[in-house]
UniProtKB/Swiss-Prot annotation:
Single GO molecular function: UDP-N-acetylglucosamine diphosphorylase activity
Catalytic center residues: 343
Binding site for acetyl-CoA: 360, 366-367, 385, 403, 420
UniProt binding sites for UDP-N-acetyl-alpha-D-glucosamine: 13-16, 27, 75, 80-81, 139, 153, 168, 224, 313, 331, 346, 357
Subunit comment: Homotrimer.
Protein name listed in UniProt: Bifunctional protein GlmU
EC number: 2.7.7.23, 2.3.1.157
Keyword Membrane in record: no
Subcellular location per the Swiss-Prot or TrEMBL entry: Cytoplasm
One GO term describing the cellular component: membrane
Length: 444
């Protein structure tokens, strides 16, 4: 970061339609780690640059909304990358300016800092390059004694140039005044009639040294198709898994655990295989997340045990020492310390006190077809198996709900509530019915 007279700016080009995505959604809004690609880049750029500006295309209100409160400018006609950058020239700031791409969401802050440092060490222009396993049709970076001479597109490259393994990633950084001048001089004398940023490189080379900062392919490879999006997701998940393990989290089978970028897991948490973390999850120290569980928008307290096959939905808070077992779903639930719901249960829009045990098959009926209603269960309550609590309803501390009950009225503290039909016995009729049914079956 710099003082107000030399503010650095990151210009993110995001006007591309992403036709290879085969989607109505702008390419920059496709998600990685449960947030739009462009938000990854903005978050990283804000760690390095003073200001961030996003260049959008026409008719992209969803994109403009997604990047608020950052400034946007619209490239009315899509006439190439240099044209897009030039659209934002009035927002370049007063110091160095970097051009980034919304479809390069995995560039790290460290790589951005290296780019900016290379520019400040005397380069007229610094750019990012990579050595992909399959260079394919990437533009090649032609160097002479460590200085970049030009970028040549694959289709225009000679056989010798095509053997160059250093490829252009498109990202570059220069001083604001020079950049404005170079952009103004980029022409469109090419088959597509577009203005390309790569043309800036030769201009910069005449003004001073142009240097290439190399970074791994996984950081710089573009996301232009669904398959490339999947590869980027795999790269991101590897980063998130490694970060979790480095922070003291045990992943029994790391490759099967999927995080969101905002997932917070404290040290000494153990996560079993095939667990998915949606947005907004916090897991406190000592918790155990068992296999095949799905968590989103929730918090899990210290030494809690979740799963296997549990689902925690938004608004759920499981306090310390709680147990949420197999095939239990919680939605907008406060589960008090030490409370348990271990089997085959749906609890929605409920508050459950500490020490309460919710038996197998219990359901809170929270929806009347129009409105949601809340169920409040006190501390140390025992809810018998196969109980139905029809909200709104309150069960007081130390109450006991008999198995199979339908509870429609409040239960005072310490009371026993039974809400089921009385059992009736009819001597011998069970055997008679079975024999009758068997006879009918034999008769066809």
């Amino acid at each position: 970061m710099t003082d107000s007279t030399h503010r650095t700016t990151a210009i993110i080009l995001a006007a591309g339609l992403g036709t290879r995505m085969k989607s109505r959604l702008p390419k920059a809004l496709h998600r990685l780690g449960n947030q739009p690609m462009i938000n990854h880049l903005i978050t990283t750029a804000r760690q390095v640059f003073d200001d961030v500006v996003v260049v959008t295309g026409p008719d992209m209100p969803e994109l403009e909304k997604a990047v608020r409160p950052f400034k946007t400018v619209t490239q009315v006609e899509r006439l190439g990358t240099a044209h897009a950058a030039n659209t934002a020239r009035d927002l370049f700031g007063t110091g160095d300016v970097a051009i980034l791409y919304a479809d390069n969401p995995l560039i790290t802050a460290e790589t951005m800092r290296r780019l900016l440092a290379a520019r400040r060490e005397g380069a007229s222009l610094a750019l990012l390059g990579m050595r992909p396993a399959e260079p394919g049709r990437y533009g090649r970076i032609v160097e002479d004694h460590g200085r970049v001479v030009k970028i040549v597109e694959f289709k225009d490259a000679t056989e010798d140039e095509r053997r160059i393994t250093l490829c252009n990633a498109g990202v570059m950084c220069a001083g604001v005044d020079d950049f404005r001048t170079w952009l103004a001089n980029v022409g469109n004398d090419n088959a597509q009639g577009e203005y390309y940023l790569t043309d800036v490189v030769e201009m910069a080379a005449k003004a001073g040294p142009v240097v290439c900062v190399e970074a791994p392919e996984a950081e710089l490879a573009g996301v232009n198709s669904r398959s490339e999006l999947a590869r980027a997701e795999a790269t991101l998940q590897t980063r998130l898994r490694n970060a979790a393990m480095d922070a003291g989290v045990t992943l029994v089978a790391p490759e099967t655990v999927f995080f969101s970028t905002d997932t917070v897991i404290e040290a000494d948490v153990t996560i079993e295989p095939n667990v998915f973390f949606g947005p907004g999850v916090k897991v406190r120290s000592g918790a155990l997340i068992r296999a095949f569980s799905h968590l989103e928008g929730c918090e899990v307290g210290e030494n809690a045990m979740i799963g296997p096959y549990a689902r925690l939905r938004p608004g759920t808070l499981c306090a310390a020492q709680t147990h949420v077992g197999n095939f239990v779903e919680l939605k907008n639930v406060e589960l008090g310390e030490g409370a348990k719901a271990n089997h085959l249960t749906y609890l929605g829009d409920a508050s459950i006190g500490s020490g309460t045990n919710v038996g197998a098959g219990t359901i809170t009926c929270n929806y009347d077809g129009v409105f949601k209603h809340r169920t409040t269960i006190g501390e140390r309550v025992f809810v018998g198996s196969d109980s139905i609590l029809v909200a709104p309803v309150t069960v007081g501390d130390d109450a006991l709900i008999a198995a199979g009950s339908v509870i429609t009225s409040d239960v005072p503290p310490g009371d026993l509530a039974l809400g089921r039909a009385r059992q009736t016995l009819k001597s011998g009729q069970g055997l008679q019915i079975k024999q009758s049914l068997k006879a009918r079956k034999e008769q066809g």
